[in-house]
């Protein structure tokens, strides 16, 4: 490589985007060109951000690492999406992550933008040892109650795995019907990488489904509100009545049925 003084700013930038040596970084720091100084400042800011992110991901793996040490190889994180909406199914997902993965930004799905969730959704599916999605339909929610329907969706997700899980990490709940060692973790989607990954799979899968249901029932705006009781959704409910995918046991829907 030629000396840095003979390199253009563009050439220096290209080297900094690889894995520059300490010698190269020192040379950049000593270069008096303003463009090079800006590049080196940006490089170290990005390096520090990557370090902080690596430490955050490491903290998210605390539960998994302890379980791996105890001999549990396949740890399945489980989470749900859609307990609160007035329409559509409750969807659960389970995900078994490898010990080494590259999912920058992995977090509780509620803390991510839609575009970031979509990107991670694809990355998780590509890198996971195993994953599956399960759901419980509105009629099942009405017949059981939302808590039991959520557990049913989670059970279906676990049963859909092609890889046998050795331990389950579940957001807030326990699934006694599954005879697999398990642990419920309050706010698990913010504390466990496996549960965070499952939360993204569940959320994005449900959002996609509500987009499809919007084509069948466009008057309710499901693609936008995902079935939640927004002002526009409630107005459509009063105007158009109850659809086949509304949860009849939920108060606003029940009130509309009582009016009819």
Swiss-Prot record:
Its cofactor is Mn(2+); Mg(2+). GO terms for molecular function: manganese ion binding; RNA binding; RNA-DNA hybrid ribonuclease activity. It is an enzyme of class 3 (hydrolase). SUPFAM superfamilies: Ribonuclease H-like. It catalyses: Endonucleolytic cleavage to 5'-phosphomonoester. It comes from the Bacteria. Disulfide bonds: none annotated. Manganese or magnesium. Binds 1 divalent metal ion per monomer in the absence of substrate. May bind a second metal ion after substrate binding. Gene3D superfamilies: Ribonuclease H-like superfamily/Ribonuclease H (3.30.420.10). A divalent metal cation binds at residues 79-80, 171. Keywords: Cytoplasm, Endonuclease, Hydrolase, Manganese, Metal-binding, Nuclease. CDD domains: RNase_HII_bacteria_HII_like (cd07182). Its main location: cytoplasm. One of its GO terms (cellular component) is ribonuclease H2 complex. Residues 73-260 form the RNase H type-2 domain. PROSITE patterns: RNASE_H_2. One of its GO terms (biological process) is mismatch repair. It is found in: Cytoplasm. Endonuclease that specifically degrades the RNA of RNA-DNA hybrids. HAMAP family: RNase_HII_B. Belongs to the RNase HII family. NCBIfam families: PRK00015.1-1, PRK00015.1-3, PRK00015.1-4. This is Ribonuclease HII. It comes from Desulfitobacterium hafniense (strain Y51). The gene is rnhB.
